[in-house]
Amino acid sequence: MAGLKRAVGIGAGIAALASACAAYAASPAIVAAIHARKANYKEIGGAFKTINDEIKTGSPDLATIRPLARDLLTRASGQLKYFPKGSGPVSGEKTRAKAAIWADQATFVKLHNDMLGAARLLQAATVSGDVAAMTSARTALGGACKSCHDKFRESD
């Protein structure tokens, strides 16, 4: 009889735990937003790396970096939609987004706007072909990204 009570107790405990875990499971929309966010950042990072590498040559291939700068700006412009409430650590999904994003939206949006301004400068500089302007805009964009990452992204 004691064995049966113990088995029932363990079963009830497992059921309660499973129920609690299910209550904290992220919705499909949140999971999709997190995956889209990661994919978007991967594309932004890849574009930035290629642009940066080209600028470092001193004679960047404009045919390569112009579309990348335009794509980077487009992707950055739509970035906030990938941060719906519940898509941070509370989701239970693997994400480097800190809860501070939702706790301090004003700062997050300000830093996002700083990044957009720098991305616009970079895109305009690639259109003009002015390497000095590209270098300056690239540095500003890297700094804007770093400012946000330092405050709102978990380290590797």
Map each language-model feature to its residues.
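Processing junctions and N-termini across compartments
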Residues: 19, 139-142
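N-terminal signal peptide c-region/cleavage motif recognized by signal peptidases
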Residues: 13, 20-22
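Hydrophobic alpha-helical segments, especially transmembrane helices
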Residues: 6-7, 38, 150
